[in-house]
């Protein structure tokens, strides 16, 4: 799950403990989020920064929540076409599990994995939520080492 550290970074999640992962306005990313289950782990990926990469780990606490920002005209992610009776956009509640000792950069990820193993490395990929195959996730966790 990608976020720009200036908008919401791993330090924000550490401080808050949990967060609503809201503001998803792409149907494919929304559908990936809908496929998550309570207890799933998610990598926290800092994007649009130098260097971008995997920095932390989160756990899914709640799923299928209605994204409140879609109804708020003052919110950045307001969607005037969204309807309270049939909302378009969901969010999930995520819990901070920890930060890795070192960020695993996009360049390092590209050297170690294929696009099939890790879709986030595909050039031009703008989705903020992407699945990671189980075997790749296990390998990443081993490479990244313990959380702190």
Annotate each PLM feature:
Residues 1, 58-61, 133:
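GIY-YIG nuclease signature motif recognition
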Residues 56-127:
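Aromatic- and Lys/Arg-enriched surface recognition patch
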Residues 45-52:
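Short, charged beta-turn/beta-strand-edge "cap" motif at the junction between a beta-strand
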Residues 99, 123-144:
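Charge/polar-rich, low-complexity and marginally structured segments
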Residues 1-38, 136-137, 146-148:
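Compositionally biased, charged N-terminal/linker segments
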Residues 12-13, 70-71, 105-107, 140-143:
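A short secondary-structure junction signal
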Residues 2-4, 45, 97, 124, ...:
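Structured loops at beta-to-helix junctions and adjacent beta-edge loops in soluble globular domains
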